[in-house]
Swiss-Prot record:
It catalyses: L-kynurenine + NADPH + O2 + H(+) = 3-hydroxy-L-kynurenine + NADP(+) + H2O. Its cofactor is FAD. The keyword Protease does not apply. Transmembrane segments: none annotated. Catalyzes the hydroxylation of L-kynurenine (L-Kyn) to form 3-hydroxy-L-kynurenine (L-3OHKyn). Required for synthesis of quinolinic acid. This is Kynurenine 3-monooxygenase.
Length: 456
């Protein structure tokens, strides 16, 4: 379709987090936005997402929400997390702060609460939302799309100018684009899966464990995490290998899950009274990384968020990255009247950064499950904090760049690799920081790391 036919009209597939945020951003710019969602209205029917892992909202995501005038409404439902609360098999939990103080924190928010908030704001901005519309087929040449209402199998056909795929990792639009022209899709599944559980609130409605932290029970090849909700509950997620001992293959029944928690997560077990029932009710979820050689089909379709570059959840950046995508696409639509140019420029602007955070998310899993209790890791963390205190604009911790700043992911990855080398070399053979050669370190830091924009 020619961009001149209806230059300010887009059809969005998927009314999840990214779809709703993009709808707000573009509706506020004067675009006519229509969203089609395969599920029912969550405000009426209740939330039906295939996954409910809590989301970690960082500065990137908050910046995108500010662009849409949505930050205040979202933050009212978020819970602050100061750091990781590490739970050993025995002994007291220890807090590892994310940043220097409470200005450097992340926020936990329940996916359903966030989706409903953004959905309300999208409609208020003027977007139209159609529920029970599962994308079935697309005729890209004629500009027609057919949807099916799964309640009665009735078809619904529409005419479109261009489609935006914000329909997640299992994107139906991506599949339709693949049928039209191969897009070089590759999915690498992790050899681990996850299962969701819940810590209920106390009888008085309060939190059973520290509310302002992301709780981690690291156990080497596997781990359990818990993120707070604003209603006093915690969403618990167990990440476990698919095979081996222990694994989902060896922990099938609720009784086997009880035995696993009694042995490896003894302080978590009494917090999850419905462990057995939830274990048997909730199937394991898959974890994977999606890459594609092309995110758009000239000016007729484009993908963003998980539909373009799904990642494992271990850096808490999937949503934040998708929200950055929304802002980037809106900016390219501002800059280019031709949709094919806008979509191509969007992909060019975001491809390297998406690949970088996908890599960092995989690396963070190893850190969370294997290293957070390791003495050498803790020594490197201590040195990292000292280097940041001495040269705050040059030595900026990895987590700070990714989470508290909006440093491009690709730049954060490149700098993090240099900083990791510096930390490894400086701590080699040491058990504490008393014999660190600070003069030599200053020379290395200034030689290898330029000042970073935004660091302070």
């Amino acid at each position: 379709m020619s961009a001149a036919a209806s230059p300010r009209s887009l059809t969005l597939i998927g009314a999840g987090l990214a779809g709703c945020l993009l709808a707000i951003l573009l509706s506020r710019r004067g675009w006519q936005i229509t969203l089609y969602e395969r599920r029912g209205d969550p405000r009426i029917k209740g939330y039906e997402s295939g996954r409910s892992i809590n989301l970690a909202l960082a500065e990137r995501g908050r910046h995108a929400l500010r662009q849409a005038c949505a930050e205040d409404a979202v933050m009212a439902k978020a819970v602050m997390m100061r750091g990781r609360m590490i739970h050993p098999v025995s002994g007291e939990p220890q807090l590892q702060r994310y940043g220097r103080d409470d200005s450097e924190v992340i926020w936990s928010i329940h996916r359903a609460a966030l989706n409903v908030t953004l959905l309300d704001l999208a409609e208020q901005a003027g977007a139209r939302v159609h529920f029970y519309r599962r994308l079935h087929t697309v005729d890209f040449d004629a500009g027609y799309a057919r949807f099916i209402d799964d309640r009665d199998d009735q078809p619904h056909e529409i005419h479109f100018q261009a489609l935006v795929g914000s329909d997640g990792a299992g994107s139906a639009l991506r599949a339709a684009m693949q049928r039209k022209a191969p897009v070089g899709e590759h999915i690498a599944f992790l050899d681990h899966s996850y299962k969701e559980l819940e810590i209920p609130p106390r009888a008085d409605g309060g939190f059973r464990i520290e509310r302002n932290a992301l709780h981690i029970w690291p156990r080497g090849r596997y781990m359990c995490i818990a993120l707070p909700n604003d209603g006093g509950t915690f969403t618990v997620t167990l990440f476990l290998p698919n095979e081996g001992m222990p694994s989902f293959a060896t922990t099938r029944s609720g009784d086997e899950a009880l035995a696993l928690f009694a042995r490896d997560f003894p302080d978590a077990l009494p917090l999850i009274p419905q462990l057995k029932e939830h274990w048997e009710e909730h199937p394991p979820g898959l974890l994977g990384t999606l890459t594609r050689e092309r995110w758009h089909l000239d000016g007729r379709a484009v993908l963003l968020g998980d539909a373009a570059h799904a990642m494992v959840p271990f850096h808490g950046q999937g949503m934040n990255c998708a929200f950055e995508d929304c802002v980037a696409l809106a900016e390219q639509l501002d800059a280019h009247s031709d949709l094919s140019e806008a979509f191509a420029a969007f992909e060019a602007a975001r491809r390297d950064d998406a690949a970088a955070i996908q890599q960092m998310a995989l690396e963070n899993y190893l850190e969370m499950r294997d290293r957070v209790g390791d003495a050498q890791f803790l020594l490197q963390r201590a040195l990292e904090q000292q280097l940041q205190a001495r040269w705050p604009t040059r030595f900026v911790p990895h987590y700070t760049m990714v989470t508290f700043l909006r440093t491009r992911y690709a730049i954060a990855l490149a700098r993090s690799e240099i900083q990791r080398e510096i930390l490894l070399e400086a701590t080699h053979g040491h058990t504490d920081l008393s014999r660190i050669d600070w003069v030599a370190l200053e020379t290395v830091v200034h030689a290898r790391l330029e000042p970073l924009e935004g660091a302070h």
